[in-house]
C-alpha cells in the first residue's frame, strides 16, 4: 500500500508513503515533563528501579547485544557490564552534568550514534583508570554505535546508585547466573538466606569479612550493606541530620569510608575467574569498592595454594607471604559467610581435601 485516505465529514486528507518521517523517541515524558527530560535527563529526574523492571531492562539489553552484535552470551554479558559501569561512574561524577545519555535524534541516525559512542567511551576511560583491578588499560567498548545508543537509551532514565540494593542485587545475580554459571553444578544462594545469615552474625565496621566461595559476591555485598547502614546511622548522629540533608563534604567523607572498608576488610575467593570478575563488579556497583577478590581453589590445603595467590593475599592483609602456610597461620578473618561448594552435582572425593573438614571427612 503506497498511501492512505482519511475522511471526516466533508474534509479529506491524503498521505503518500514516505511523506511523513517518524521519530523513535527514547520514552514518553511524564505528565509534567518535556522531551528534554527523556533526551538528556538531569540527576533530579533519574528514577529508582522497582520490582523486576531493572532485571527486565538488563535482559532486554543483553538480548539486544547478543542478536545485533553477534556476540555469544558471555561476551555479550561483559560488554553490557562495561556500559553499566559507565552509567554508575557518570552518576558518581558529581557535580558535573550527566554525560550518559542519547537524544532521540542521535539514536536515529548513524552520525548521532557515533557521537554517543564517543561520549560513552570517554566515560569508560575514567572507569578503567578508577578500576584497574577489573579492566585492562587497552579494554574498550566493542559494541556497534547503533547497539550502544540503544543500550544507553534503555538505562539512562534510571539511577543505579539510588535503586534499592535488593532490586539491583536480584537483577545482577540473575543475569550473572544465566551467563556465567556454566554446567558445573554451581548455584547462587537466595538473597533472603544471605540477609538472614548476615543479620544473625551482625558484622561490625572494623571486622575482616571473608567469603571463601564467593560466586557473584552476594554474601559480601549483603554484609557490607549491613555495615554501611550502621555507618550511616553513626554519621547522621555526628552531623545531626539524615543523609538526604548532608552537605557535599559529609557525603564525600562517607563514600571515602565505604571505599576504605571495601579495600581493607572484604575478601572473596572463587575458583572461577569469570565469577571473580563478576564479584568485583558487584562490589563496585553497590558499594564503590571492589574489595580483595582473588581466584583460588579455597578447598585446597593452604600449603597447596599457588605462590601468586599467597602473595596477593599477604599483600592485601599486610603480612609476609611466608606466614600463609597452614591452617594455624591464616586466622586473619573475623567473620566468614559462605555457602561451601559441596553438592550432588559437584562431589568432592579427594581425601587430601576432605580430611581437613570434620563433617566432610571420609
Residue locations for each model-derived region?
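Non-catalytic C-terminal interaction segments of nucleic acid-processing enzymes
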Residues: 15-49
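Class I SAM-dependent transferase core
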Residues: 60, 64-65, 167-192, 198-200
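Conserved S-adenosyl-L-methionine
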Residues: 187-320, 327-331, 335, 343
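Mobile active-site "lid"/loop adjacent to the S-adenosyl-L-methionine
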Residues: 235-239, 342-362
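Structural motif
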Residues: 66-80, 161-166
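Nucleic-acid nuclease catalytic cores
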Residues: 1-16
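Long recognition/docking surfaces used for binding and targeting
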Residues: 81, 85-177
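Short amphipathic alpha-helical segments and their helix-coil junctions
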Residues: 52-71, 151-153
Amino acid at each position: 500500500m503506497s498511501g492512505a485516505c482519511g475522511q471526516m465529514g466533508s474534509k479529506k486528507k491524503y498521505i503518500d508513503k514516505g511523506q511523513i518521517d517518524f521519530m523513535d523517541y527514547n520514552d514518553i515524558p511524564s505528565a509534567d515533563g518535556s522531551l528534554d527530560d527523556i533526551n538528556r535527563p538531569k540527576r533530579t529526574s533519574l528514577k529508582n528501579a522497582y520490582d523486576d523492571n531493572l532485571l527486565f531492562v538488563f535482559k532486554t539489553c543483553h538480548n539486544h547485544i547478543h542478536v545485533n552484535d553477534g556476540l555469544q552470551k558471555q561476551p555479550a554479558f561483559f560488554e553490557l557490564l562495561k556500559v553499566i559501569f559507565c552509567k554508575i561512574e557518570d552518576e558518581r561524577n558529581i557535580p558535573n552534568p550527566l554525560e550518559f545519555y542519547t537524544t532521540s535524534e542521535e539514536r536515529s541516525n548513524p552520525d548521532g550514534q557515533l557521537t554517543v559512542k564517543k561520549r560513552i567511551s570517554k566515560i569508560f576511560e575514567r572507569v578503567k583508570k578508577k578500576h584497574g583491578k577489573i579492566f585492562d588499560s587497552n579494554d574498550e567498548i566493542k559494541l556497534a554505535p547503533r547497539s550502544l545508543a540503544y543500550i544507553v537509551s534503555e538505562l539512562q532514565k534510571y539511577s543505579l546508585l539510588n535503586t534499592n540494593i535488593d532490586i539491583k542485587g536480584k537483577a545482577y545475580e540473575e543475569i550473572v547466573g544465566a551467563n556465567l554459571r556454566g554446567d558445573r553444578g554451581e548455584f547462587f544462594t537466595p538473597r533472603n538466606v544471605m540477609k538472614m545469615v548476615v543479620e544473625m552474625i551482625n558484622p561490625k565496621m572494623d571486622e575482616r569479612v571473608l567469603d571463601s566461595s564467593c560466586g557473584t559476591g552476594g554474601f559480601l555485598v549483603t554484609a557490607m550493606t549491613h555495615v554501611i547502614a550502621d555507618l550511616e546511622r553513626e554519621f547522621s548522629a555526628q552531623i545531626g541530620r539524615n543523609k538526604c540533608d548532608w552537605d557535599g563534604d559529609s557525603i564525600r567523607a562517607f563514600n571515602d569510608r565505604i571505599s576504605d572498608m571495601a579495600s581493607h576488610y572484604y575478601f572473596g575467593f572463587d575458583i572461577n575467574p569469570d565469577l571473580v570478575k563478576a564479584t568485583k563488579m558487584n562490589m563496585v556497583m553497590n558499594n564503590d569498592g571492589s574489595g580483595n577478590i582473588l581466584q583460588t581453589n579455597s578447598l585446597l590445603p593452604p600449603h597447596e595454594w599457588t605462590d601468586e595467590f599467597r602473595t596477593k593475599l599477604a599483600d592485601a592483609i599486610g603480612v609476609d607471604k611466608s606466614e600463609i602456610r597452614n591452617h594455624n597461620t591464616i586466622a586473619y578473618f573475623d567473620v566468614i559467610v559462605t555457602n561451601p561448594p559441596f553438592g550432588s552435582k559437584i562431589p568432592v572425593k579427594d581425601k587430601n581435601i576432605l580430611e581437613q573438614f570434620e563433617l566432610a571427612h571420609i
